[in-house]
């Protein structure tokens, strides 16, 4: 298996991206192609990583984080993200991982690979740690404006991802709303509620913001604007709680003693709240495998995103997703 990694994408590229790729190749034993400026990548690579597992594919352009996604992808055909998806399209890679401009990554994926038949809008799905296991939040930034049918398709695609990659049987699907009662929310959400209710999905109704992590639903559907805000609010809250807990522990001798004896517990606690653990968000609905990472991803996050890409390919999620979309529309 070969994973193409956009080495120039992200706030800390190429250093952190290369470090994450090395971790993935060493631990997973897979082939990785680092796409980007070969000189910059070689400096960071420095002969590290298992011999023969990491290669470099040079390209001369990079899509910056603040560039217009569609314009950049169309004009910069030699950019690292565009070239990475070209490798996938031409059979020289099995998946693409990028921590770069998420809009450009989505655009490059759709332009280069195309959409699964029947899918109107590909979406970003994020598997976060809930009270009773993983919870898939979809969409987390791919589509800020959605029609009700798009939300229905998000649920169908996430259902395929959950059953194949997370091993969930008939996962519970809910729609993010401002109240639990049927009839709540704006017109978009109310109409999507009816579509989801009539679908073969295991629909459990509305999910309030405070219930995202509760386990009421294992798949939470929303538009990309709300989903991105919810995800980043959770990330910020997790960082704040971890920071304040550490400050409180270090403020007294009793706290320091507790921190010393309970450090393994606190490490596990911090791990459940660290966005690096979920690595990235798969783009569901494209004819291929693409994983979008946080722009500020650490080496651990890049490694985990690469592992997610491997799981996606090995579990044949794309085939299952295509089949479920066709079945649900029949």
Regions found by a protein language model. Give the residues of each.
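Glycine-rich phosphate-binding loop
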Residues: 87-106, 184, 189-195, 199-270
């Amino acid at each position: 298996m070969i994973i193409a990694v956009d080495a120039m994408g992200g706030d800390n590229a190429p250093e952190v991206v290369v470090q994450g790729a090395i971790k993935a190749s060493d631990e997973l034993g897979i082939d990785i192609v680092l796409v980007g400026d070969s000189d910059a990548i070689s400096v960071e690579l420095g002969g590290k990583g298992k011999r023969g597992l990491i290669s470099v594919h040079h390209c001369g352009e990079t899509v910056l984080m603040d560039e217009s996604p569609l314009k950049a992808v169309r004009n910069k055909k030699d950019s690292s993200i565009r070239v990475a998806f070209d490798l996938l399209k031409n059979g020289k890679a099995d998946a693409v991982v990028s921590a770069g401009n998420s809009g450009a990554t989505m655009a490059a994926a759709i332009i280069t690979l195309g959409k699964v038949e029947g899918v109107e809008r590909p979406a970003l799905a994020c598997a976060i740690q809930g009270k009773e296991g993983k919870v898939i939040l979809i969409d987390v930034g791919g589509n800020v404006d959605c029609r009700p049918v798009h939300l229905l398709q998000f649920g169908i695609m996430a259902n395929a991802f959950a059953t194949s990659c997370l091993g969930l049987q008939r996962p519970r699907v809910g729609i993010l709303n401002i109240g639990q009662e049927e009839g709540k929310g704006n017109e978009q959400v109310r109409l999507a509620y009816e579509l989801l209710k009539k679908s073969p999905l295991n629909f459990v109704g509305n999910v309030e913001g405070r219930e995202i992590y509760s386990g009421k639903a294992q798949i939470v559907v929303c538009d990309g604007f709300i989903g991105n805000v919810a995800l980043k609010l959770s990330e910020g809250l997790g960082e704040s709680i971890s920071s304040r807990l550490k400050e409180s522990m270090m403020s007294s001798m009793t706290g320091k003693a507790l921190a010393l004896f309970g450090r393994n517990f606190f490490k596990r606690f911090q791990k459940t709240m660290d966005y690096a653990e979920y690595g990235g968000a798969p783009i569901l609905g494209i004819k291929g495998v693409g994983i979008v990472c946080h722009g500020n991803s650490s080496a651990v996050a890049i490694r985990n995103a690469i592992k997610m890409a491997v799981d996606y390919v090995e579990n044949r999620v794309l085939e299952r997703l295509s089949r479920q979309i066709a079945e649900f529309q029949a």
